[in-house]
């Protein structure tokens, strides 16, 4: 049976700051595959997530900031779309509170709309607006919807995104209690999602749970530059009901998509 893939994006996570507040992520890191990766500058969410989710470099997808001006994303399908094109029995799910990732109205989206598959219930998308309503509230909605989707639909390939950590980093810096508290909150959501995956895996469904981030933060909060802290990212991958992936110990952010698709081949 093909592995089901759950890719979780935690925006703006400094791994060296928050691990003591993230027991679920620590456990995944210790039991699974782990490697640090280095983000191509500029370290904004737009270009970084475009690269991570499509496998195209900045110069290819044309996203260089969060305005998405002049982007070429239509020519670079995302992970979920490519998984479907690879096998048209594939079901996909995406949930995010940062609209450019999933909202067809406005900037982007990085995750293609795929209306025909959506009508056929093969592609489900939850769009929320954390920029307007705040990510503390929106991330909770995203987590609940993703847990429901995993438990009741078991999509073959999913992308679930949280931005509360990044929001706290901008507002309070990345070394204070507020940032650590946001990490703890997202880690609790991660635990809920993992429990849903484990329940599915107990029915002989193999799952691969992958966690990554798009950039780090400087201590006082902020990113966009080319410092080591801003460019620091990672990939954690843990097999549930299957072995951990045999991936190279060093790779570039744009190579993650192909590694994930190979797990579905």
Where are the regions that the model predicts?
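Feature captures the catalytic ectodomains and active-site-proximal regions of enzymes
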Residues: 1-265
């Amino acid at each position: 049976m093909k592995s089901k893939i759950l890719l979780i994006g935690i925006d703006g996570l400094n791994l060296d700051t928050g691990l003591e507040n993230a027991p679920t992520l620590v456990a995944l890191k210790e039991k699974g595959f782990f490697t640090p990766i280095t983000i191509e500058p500029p370290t904004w969410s737009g270009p970084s997530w475009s690269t991570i989710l499509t496998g195209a470099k900045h110069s290819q997808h044309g996203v260089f900031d969060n305005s998405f001006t002049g982007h070429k994303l239509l020519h670079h399908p995302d992970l979920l779309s490519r998984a479907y094109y690879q096998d048209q029995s594939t079901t996909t799910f995406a949930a995010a509170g940062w609209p450019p990732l999933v909202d067809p109205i406005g900037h982007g989206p990085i995750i293609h709309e795929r209306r025909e598959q959506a009508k056929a219930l093969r592609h489900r998308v939850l769009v929320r607006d954390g920029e307007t309503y705040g990510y503390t509230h929106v991330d909770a909605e995203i987590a609940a919807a993703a847990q429901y989707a995993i438990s009741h639909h078991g999509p073959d390939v999913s992308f679930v995104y949280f931005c509360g950590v990044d929001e706290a980093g901008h507002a309070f810096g990345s070394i204070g209690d507020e940032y650590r508290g946001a990490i703890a909150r997202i880690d609790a959501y991660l635990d809920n999602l993992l429990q849903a995956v484990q329940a599915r895996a107990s029915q002989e469904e193999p799952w691969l749970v992958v966690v990554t981030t798009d950039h780090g933060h400087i201590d006082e909060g902020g990113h966009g530059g080319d410092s080591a802290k801003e460019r620091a990212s990672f990939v954690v991958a843990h097999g549930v009901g299957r072995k951990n992936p045999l991936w190279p110990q060093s790779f570039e952010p744009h190579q993650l998509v192909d590694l994930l698709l190979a797990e579905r081949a």
